[in-house]
Amino acid sequence: MLQINSRLAVIDGWLVDTVKRKPINFRSPEVRLLLPNDDDYKKLSQQNLVDWTRLKKDSNSVLVGVKSMELFKHIKLVLREFFLLEDGRIILKRIRSKSRYKVVKKLTCKCCRLYLPKWGTVYIHPMLKDKEKPLAGVCEFSLDVNPDREYPLIEINVSHQYIIIEGFLLYLNERRLYRWNDNNLRGQVGLTKWAHLRKTYNPVSLDILYSLNSNFYFVKDDLLFQLLGKRVFVKFCKVMENGKCGKAPLWYRVKRTTTAKATHIAYAISNSTAPDSFKSKNNDYRFIVREKPIVENTISNLDYSDIKKQQFTEAEVVKRKISADISQIENVHTQFNSQKEKNNIRVNKVSSEILDQISKFPVSRVTLLLMSAGQDKNYIELVEELARRLEKICIEKTTQSLEEIRDTFQANPEMQARFDKEYYQSIEEYKITLELIKEDLLITLIKQMENMWAAEKKFSTEEEYVSPRFLVADGFLIDLAEEKPINPKDPRLLTLLKDHQRAMIDQMNLVKWNDFKKYQDPIPLKAKTLFKFCKQIKKKFLRGADFKLHTLPTEANLKYEPERMTVLCSCVPILLDDQTVQYLYDDSIIPEFEATSSYATKQSKCGRKMSLQMEPDLLFQEAIRRMRHLTAYDVLRRNYIAAFEELYMGNCND
C-alpha cells in the first residue's frame, strides 16, 4: 500500500479513499480536489492504476472478481444478490425481468459498487489467489437446492396446490404459508383427509413458530426460501433478563439489519397474520431463518450451538402441545362429522428441479409429466395452449347445454332458484372433471396425432409393376383394373399372369392374407399407394380410449351405442376366403366424428317438450338427471376428444 496523503492511498493499483472506505476513479474530477498538492498529484500519476473502463470492456457481467485481498480490507462491502444466466452473464437480481435467458444459479456475495460514466455500474468482489485465506466476514453464497429431492404436492380440487417443506405448508398459488390448525383449511381439505395428512406429514412448523417465545425458527432446506421469494437479512442478538445486564444472556432473538451486518437470510412473517392468542405487541415479526450462515463472522461472540439448542428445547415442548390440541380437535369433530366430503384431494411427489422450472401455480399434471420427461420449454407451452383451447371449447358447449336446461324454469322463479343451487354446483364439478380428463387423455391424443405419420405395420414401400394390370406397393398386390388389393395366392392369377410374373410375386415380401383373420377390428395402415389406387367406402366404427377404431357392437349390445363414440371412416374392404370382410384404414386421417347420436337427438326432442308434459317436481327431477348426464365423465370425455378432432381438422375458429 502506497500512502499518497492522509486520506488517499494506492492499493494494488486501486486508488482508495481510506476515510470513506471506497475506491475512487483516477479520472474523476474529485481526485484533483482531494490532491491540491501538485507533488502528490504527480506522485499519483506515476502509479500504474487500474483503468475502470476496462472492467466493463473485459466482462459481460456486472460482477467482476479482483485478486487483491488487501484492497477489500480497506473498503466497505455490501451484500448483493445476483443471477447467473445460461449465457454465462451475471446480472443484478432486480433486473431479472429484463432478461430472456434462463437463470442457472442464484448467488449472493459481499461486494463494492463502482459507477462508470457512460458504462454503467459494476460490482467488484474478492477473488482468491492460490493459498490465500478468505477475509473474515467476506464470502460468496448461493441457495443450495438439491435437484433430486422430492416433496409432497397436495392438490385440492385440482386448482389449489400446496407443498410441504420441513413441516411448513406453502400455498403455491399465492406463495404464502398456512397454519395447519386453520379452520378454513380444515374445511377445504375435509376432516378425514386433514387428519390423514397431518399423521403422514405433520405440517405444523408454522403453528410451532407462532407459539414460540423465540421469534425465529431454523430451516435447512433452501427450497423454501427459493419458493417464498422475498428475503430479509438478519442477525442474532442477546436479550437480558428484564433488560438488565447479567453474566450470561437468557435468550437469543433475531433482528433485521443491513446487508453489511447480516449473518443470515430469513423470511419475515408479520404477527398480524398470527392468531390473536399468539400476537405480541413487542414483536412485529417472526422469522424463518436459513440455518446456514451467509458469512462466517469471526468477530461475533455468539455461540450458534446455544441458539440452536434454545430453539430445539422450546420447539419440542410446543410441538407436543400442538399435536395434543390437534388430536383433540380431530376426535371432537369426528364424532359430529356426518357430512360426505366431496373435495378431490390428491398427493403426488415432485422434485425441486421441476419446481424450479415453474413460474406460476397451479400447474397441471400434464405439464409436470412433460417437464419430468425433459420436454422442450416451447413444446410444453404449445401443449398448454392446446389444453387451454380444448378446455374453452368444452366449457362453452357444456355451459350452453346446461343453460338450455336452466331456461326451462324461467317461468317459475321459485323452481329456478331451487335448480340454480344444483346448477352452479354442477358447473364447478364439471370443470374439475375436465381437468381430470385432460390428465387422462391429452398426452395420449397428442402421441396418437404424432404417430399418425408413423406406420403401425411396416411393409415394403417399393412400387413395382408385375404387369400393366398388377402393381406391388406397400406390401400388397393391387389389381388396378378392379381397384382393390388381391390375395397373392388367388387362383385367378394362374390365368392372369405368366410363370415368371408369378415367380416374381413369390419372391416379394407381401402381406399374408391369412394373417387378417387374426384381427377382429379394422387395421390401421400407413400405405399411401394402396389408398390412392383402391376404391374406398365410408363405414361407421367406434373409437375407443386408445384412439383406435373398433367394429360396431352386435345387435345384442346395440343399446350401449349412445355411450360410445361413433366415427365415419373411409376404408378399403378385403374379402377373405371364409367370406368375412376385413377393413384397412389410413390412420394418418382423423375420421369424421358423429357429434349428434340418435340418443342425443332423442333427448333434445324430449327436452323441448318436457316443460309442456311434466309436473313441476317431475320436471325438476328430469332436469337434474339431464344435467348429471351432460356433466358425467364419459360424456365430457367424448366432447373433449371431439374438440381435439375439431382443432386438428381446422374446423374450430377459437
Curated annotation (Swiss-Prot):
It is found in: Nucleus; Chromosome, Centromere. Keywords: Centromere, Chromosome, Nucleus, Repressor, Transcription, Transcription regulation. It holds the Pfam family Sir1. The keyword Repressor applies. The keyword Nucleus applies. Residues 322-654 are annotated as: Sufficient for interaction with SIR4. Residues 449-587 are annotated as: ORC interacting region (OIR). GO terms for cellular component: chromosome, centromeric region; nucleus. InterPro entries: ORC1-binding_dom, Sir1_ORC-binding. Involved in the establishment, but not the maintenance, of heterochromatic silencing at the cryptic mating-type loci HMR and HML. Is recruited by interacting with the ORC1 subunit of the origin recognition complex (ORC), which binds to HML-I or HMR-E silencers, DNA elements that direct the formation of silent chromatin at the mating-type loci. Establishes transcriptional silencing by recruiting the three other SIR proteins, SIR2, SIR3, and SIR4, that function directly in silenced chromatin and establish repression. Also found in centromeric chromatin. Interacts (via OIR domain) with ORC1 (via BAH domain). Interacts with SIR4. Interacts with CAC1. This is Regulatory protein SIR1. It comes from Saccharomyces cerevisiae (strain RM11-1a). The gene is SIR1.
